[in-house]
Swiss-Prot record:
Biological role: Responsible for the thiolytic cleavage of straight chain 3-keto fatty acyl-CoAs (3-oxoacyl-CoAs). Plays an important role in fatty acid peroxisomal beta-oxidation. Catalyzes the cleavage of short, medium, long, and very long straight chain 3-oxoacyl-CoAs.
Protein name: 3-ketoacyl-CoA thiolase, peroxisomal
Subcellular location: Peroxisome
Underlying gene: ACAA1
Catalysis performed (reactions): an acyl-CoA + acetyl-CoA = a 3-oxoacyl-CoA + CoA; 2 acetyl-CoA = acetoacetyl-CoA + CoA; tetradecanoyl-CoA + acetyl-CoA = 3-oxohexadecanoyl-CoA + CoA; hexanoyl-CoA + acetyl-CoA = 3-oxooctanoyl-CoA + CoA
NCBIfam families associated with the record: AcCoA-C-Actrans
Family affiliation: Belongs to the thiolase-like superfamily. Thiolase family.
Pathway(s) of this molecule: Lipid metabolism; peroxisomal fatty acid beta-oxidation
Group of enzyme by EC: transferase
Provenance organism: Homo sapiens (Human)
Amino acid sequence: MQRLQVVLGHLRGPADSGWMPQAAPCLSGAPQASAADVVVVHGRRTAICRAGRGGFKDTTPDELLSAVMTAVLKDVNLRPEQLGDICVGNVLQPGAGAIMARIAQFLSDIPETVPLSTVNRQCSSGLQAVASIAGGIRNGSYDIGMACGVESMSLADRGNPGNITSRLMEKEKARDCLIPMGITSENVAERFGISREKQDTFALASQQKAARAQSKGCFQAEIVPVTTTVHDDKGTKRSITVTQDEGIRPSTTMEGLAKLKPAFKKDGSTTAGNSSQVSDGAAAILLARRSKAEELGLPILGVLRSYAVVGVPPDIMGIGPAYAIPVALQKAGLTVSDVDIFEINEAFASQAAYCVEKLRLPPEKVNPLGGAVALGHPLGCTGARQVITLLNELKRRGKRAYGVVSMCIGTGMGAAAVFEYPGN
């Protein structure tokens, strides 16, 4: 019945402000550990760098991907040939980066006998890779797999939608798929009353939380140092080692944010300061069937309890998490109050703030280490990065707990996954 109510809510559409998504209560208590559980063994990511001007501006995505693939296997001392499959999320490379990702595999000394695929569900591609590998484990295709995400927004063509029929003009929703993301942010702000001040307040909080987390070293366990080469304007090359996220601005103030001009619309409220940053980065996550992880003596960082993806109107795609999270919680038998951390991608402060309000999430539970406004949003990488950040933060806290990863998706979707940290 609850699932039906959620689906009916989708059909009524977001304009129905009277609808409040609710997850079904947990009737049987916390899930019991099962040998068939899909568990997260380990995950690492690169630092996230500013596209076009940061430490990875001249680094190809296969190199970024290889760095995290190699680190994850080395950290847990797993032989590469023990992998049953690899899935890589990517948005901007041709063919979702299928050739690039296979090259990264070989750069990481993972043998050709290990298969690989790539997936593009836009901003949720990294999380979709996790879901794809989890599906293979659940259906018995293999016991261990690697889910990754990578994006070089420095080196990719971001403005080409590909070969599209002129008939799209005949269908409103088809046309809406080509609306610039910044305009969808403005649509959310206008239709749901998310003011410029509210967006800037959200953005400031993201920067402050990320700066505090970085100063405390909270990201160190996640980040793989990457030594690479950068070229200056004169063509001079130099070697650098990138060890920390570049987009965090500790000196951000409300006054500074208020001075920024609208980025997408003359009288708009979405600015460079309250939007996610264009970024480069990669992440890799090792998943396994619990029984296999225990057999090999591998650590268990978390358990994937549910995954959901839903559709929403393309012109307000940013509302996706507000519709995906209730479905994922319902699948896991949980409510909002059962969750300690919500990692919601901050594509834009407008849509993130809307989702927090719509779901009535306690602000202190949302992105406690900051989000994409401060850290950046390398499209294919983000979902995997969020999983790693979430589970490492739950590990720092120590107790058994649940966390949610969610994001909006261009062309009108939302994805969400529920993870359990088993406790120290």
